[in-house]
Amino acid sequence: MRVQLLKHEIAKCMGWLFKRGLTSALSGNLSVRVDDVVYISPTKVPSYRVRAEDVSVVTMKGDHLAGRSPSSEMPTHLAIYKVTDSNAIVHAHSRFATALSCLGADLQSPDVEGKQLLGRIPLIPYARPGTSELAEAVSNGIKGFRGALLENHGLVAVGADLEGAYIVAEGIERAAQLVFDLSLFSRR
């Protein structure tokens, strides 16, 4: 994929995250790996305003090559790439997944579609956002899974490409919402 097209797709996907309610203006981020280069959403740019030229370009060692400053969650993205064969990551602070993460529970989708798409979504113990501790915890906990809940924080989803990671992120949020909905029915 050409670099400019890839950056455009990243900007467009940041807009999707906002429009679909998976992020607020300044929360959430995503990245795509191409060989040893990572294209990652910028810090301090509202998700609905990210443009292709804003996308940050970094090495797998974290050296900044181009674009705006990378997301503060860059260490976590790089750590995930080092332990998985994923080429894309979506990190979102969506309402239901974040609420479930605050309850301290893994996510098992209650519906057939969610079970097939997601499998089990583990809970990664709390670590302060943007830190090497979070990067280490996530890279240790996500191996073998399509995503994870980050305790008191949100979700992270991985995929072979950006669309795949986005679909997993949206699937995690939908599964978390179903868990919430079912809890309302079980109280009757």
Say what each PLM segment does.
Residues 1-188:
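Glycine-rich flexible loops
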